[in-house]
Regions:
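Core catalytic alpha/beta fold that binds nucleotide/phospho-ligands
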Residues: 1-123
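YjeF_N-associated NAD(P)HX repair module
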Residues: 119-150, 154, 278, 298, ...
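Short glycine/threonine-rich catalytic loop with a Thr-x-Gly-x-Asp
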Residues: 136-144, 154-160, 338-355, 375, ...
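Substrate-binding N-lobe of the ribokinase-like
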Residues: 140-198
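Glycine-rich phosphate/dinucleotide-binding loop and adjoining beta-alpha-beta core of small-molecule
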Residues: 176-337, 416-425
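Short, small-residue alpha-helix embedded
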Residues: 283, 344-369, 374-382
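Short, well-structured alpha-helical segments that form the helix of a local strand-helix-strand
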Residues: 296-305, 367-390, 404-412
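Charged C-terminal helix
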Residues: 387-425
Length: 425
C-alpha cells in the first residue's frame, strides 16, 4: 500500500490570537469545541492535525473547508479524523483507505503528523470481476428477481428483518419472508416492503424465485431439518437459480450426513453458496478451530471442491473459494481488508441478504453467463462491499457504535461508489 505524509508545526500562542479574533467557529465544529473544553492547547493540536491532513492530500487547504476535517478522540484519548463534503471527495479521489494522525505538545509548540494510507491496486482476482452494473432504466420490479428468505425462529425476528433489508438494499426487486407466525407483526412494521408468506406453504410458490436464502436465526429443530432436506431433494426448489445457505442451515448440515449428501447431489447441478464463519466451518469440516486456523486455505479449497459449492469463509480477512473447472485455473479470492465494526450480532444476516440481492442484480445484467460463475462473482463483490460499507459506517457512527440495522444503508452506498468508479475507468 502507498502512503503520503503531512506534518504541521504550530505555536500555541497563534491559536490564542485566533481565539481573540473570534475565528474559532470558522475552524472547529461544535463537537470539536465541546471536546476541547476550552483548552487552547487542545484546539491548537486539532488545528495542526487539520493542516497536516491537507498536506498529506497534497493540496493544502484548497477546495474544502477546515470544518470538513473533524478531529475527535476515542475513549482512550487517541485522535482520529472524520471527513465531510469536499474533503471526503479529495480523500476518495486519492483512493484513500485510512488516515492515521498523531499529536505532540512541547508546551509552546504542537506537532501533528497525518499519514494517508492509499488502497492497493486491484489484484489479479479483482481485475477479472464483472463490473457492478447500473440499474436498467427500462426495468421493473420483476427485472431484478425474487428472493425467498427462510429466517427467524420465535424471538429472532431481527434475523429475518436484517436479511430482507440487506436484499432490498442490494437491489432485489421483491423479497418474500418465510418465518414463524409470532414474528410477522413485528416484521410487517419493520419492513413493510417484504411480502409475508406461510412457512408451511412452500410448494410451487418457490418455483419462480431467483434466490433461496435459508438459515439466518432459523433454528435447528426437526421441522427446519425436514424443510432443508425437502428443498435439496425436490425439483420445485431447483427452479430457483441460486441457493444461499447461512447460519443454522449450515449447522443442520454439519449434524446430518443425509443433508450433506443431499447438498452434494444438489450442488452438482445448481449453484450453491455457503457463508460460514470460522466456528460454523469447523463444524462442517469436523475439525478443531486450531486446525482450521492453521490450514484455512487448504481446508476451504478442499470443501468447495468436494461439495461443488461457492464457499465464503468469513473472518477478519474473508476468503472465497469455488470449484475450478479443468483448465480454467483456480477460483479463489482473498479480501485482506477488514472492518472490526462488523463483529456484532446481525451483521452476518445482513451480509447473507445483501449477497442474495446482489445475485439478482448480476443475474439481470449477466444472465447469459453460467450461473455458477455469477455465484462466484456475486460472492466476491459482496465480500468487498461488506468491508467498504462497514468503513463508511464507522466514519459516521463510530467503530464501536455501528448497528446491524444501519449496515444495509452503508453497504448500498459502497456499492454505488463502486459502480461510479467502474464508469470512470
Amino acid at each position: 500500500m502507498m502512503i503520503s505524509v503531512g506534518t504541521d508545526i504550530l505555536e500555541i500562542e497563534r491559536m490564542e490570537r485566533l481565539q481573540k479574533k473570534g475565528r474559532i467557529d470558522r475552524i472547529f465544529t461544535e463537537e470539536e469545541r465541546r471536546q476541547s473544553e476550552g483548552r487552547i492547547s487542545r484546539l491548537a493540536g486539532d488545528f495542526s492535525v487539520k493542516e497536516a491532513v491537507a498536506k498529506a492530500f497534497g493540496t493544502g487547504v484548497r477546495g474544502f473547508s477546515l470544518l470538513e476535517i473533524e478531529v475527535l478522540r476515542d475513549a482512550l484519548g487517541k485522535p482520529f479524523v472524520k471527513l465531510y463534503g469536499n474533503a471526503r471527495k479529495v480523500f476518495d479521489s486519492l483512493e484513500g483507505q485510512s488516515i492515521e494522525v498523531s499529536i505532540s505538545n512541547t508546551g509552546e509548540l504542537v506537532i501533528a503528523t497525518a499519514i494517508l494510507v492509499k488502497k492497493r491496486n486491484r489484484d489479479r482476482t479483482e481485475s477479472f470481476l464483472l463490473p457492478l452494473p447500473k440499474r436498467n432504466p427500462a426495468s421493473h420490479k420483476g427485472s431484478y428477481g425474487k428472493v425467498a428468505i427462510f429466517a427467524g425462529k420465535k424471538g429472532m425476528a431481527g434475523a429475518a428483518f436484517f436479511s430482507a433489508l440487506g436484499a432490498y438494499r442490494a437491489g432485489a426487486g421483491l423479497v418474500y419472508l418465510y418465518t414463524e407466525k409470532e414474528n410477522r407483526t413485528a416484521l410487517q412494521t419493520l419492513i413493510p416492503e417484504a411480502i409475508q408468506e406461510d412457512l408451511e406453504d412452500t410448494g410451487q410458490e418457490i418455483a419462480d424465485k431467483t434466490v433461496l436464502l435459508l438459515g439466518p436465526g432459523w433454528g435447528k429443530d426437526e421441522e427446519k431439518k425436514n424443510i432443508l432436506l425437502d428443498f435439496l431433494q425436490r425439483k420445485e426448489s431447483r427452479a430457483a437459480r441460486y441457493l444461499v445457505l447461512d447460519a443454522d442451515a449450515l449447522n443442520l448440515i454439519a449434524e446430518s450426513e443425509t443433508l450433506e449428501t443431499a447438498l452434494i447431489q444438489y450442488a452438482l447441478q445448481f449453484p450453491v453458496i455457503l457463508t460460514p464463519h470460522l466456528m460454523e466451518f469447523s463444524r462442517l469440516c469436523h475439525c478443531s478451530l486450531q486446525e482450521l486456523t492453521e490450514k484455512r486455505e487448504e481446508l476451504g479449497e478442499k470443501y468447495a471442491r468436494e461439495h461443488h459449492c461457492v464457499l465464503i469463509l468469513k473472518s477478519h480477512d474473508t476468503m472465497v473459494f469455488a470449484p475450478s473447472d479443468e483448465g480454467q485455473g483456480r477460483h479463489f479470492f482473498h479480501n485482506e481488508e477488514s472492518c472490526p465494526a462488523l463483529s456484532k450480532g446481525g451483521s452476518g444476516d445482513v451480509f447473507a441478504g445483501f449477497l442474495s440481492g446482489l445475485l439478482c442484480v448480476l443475474q439481470e445484467k449477466y444472465g447469459d453467463r453460467p450461473p455458477k460463475d455469477i455465484a462466484f462473482q456475486s460472492a466476491c463483490h459482496a465480500v468487498r462491499i461488506q468491508v467498504e460499507g462497514g468503513k463508511r459506517a464507522v466514519e459516521r457512527e463510530g467503530e464501536h457504535a455501528v448497528l446491524a440495522r444501519e449496515l444495509p444503508h452503508y453497504f448500498a452506498l459502497a456499492m454505488e461508489e463502486n459502480i461510479e468508479k467502474e464508469e470512470e475507468r
